[in-house]
């Protein structure tokens, strides 16, 4: 039993590091292209694809090491563990990028989001623009953005873990 727990922990850390590493590589690519502050659905879909791939690979690797068996509980532990490790790595890099590599990142993101809001709603009044700016700045602060990234990451990681766990699970015969 302890051998199974050791394999579970090792799988979580290995695939969590892979998830975090690929996420950091993607973030570096965006930084080099000066797109790191723009967000967008393509970046979100790419991040989700990286998450799904890392979680699924971890679950399949554990199943292989566990004599071909994986129950839903183990799949959920692996998925959420991989998600937590990967998000921590990505957030640490994100802080490094925002503090060291691009200290103006929050201002760039705020201006970009505000210009997008004005483009989509040209009838915005000055008061509406000021309120929008306040909300964007509040949401872009390091503490709030970290909390949202971690929270949403766990929610999506849980959903992905459940779905992929149901797909790849294989119960032991009774």
Where are the regions a protein language model picked out?
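Short, charged juxtamembrane terminal tails flanking transmembrane helices
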Residues: 1-6, 168-174
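Individual transmembrane alpha-helix segments
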Residues: 133-155
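Membrane-helix interface/capping segments
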Residues: 59-75
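Functional transmembrane-helix hotspots
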Residues: 93-121
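Short membrane-interface loop/juxtamembrane segments of multi-pass integral membrane proteins
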Residues: 114-140
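Transmembrane alpha-helical insertion/packing segments
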Residues: 1-61
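Selective transmembrane-helix segments that form parts of the transport pathway or gating/packing helices
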Residues: 16-21, 79-88
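Alpha-helical transmembrane segments of multipass membrane proteins
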Residues: 22-26, 30, 50-55, 86-90, ...
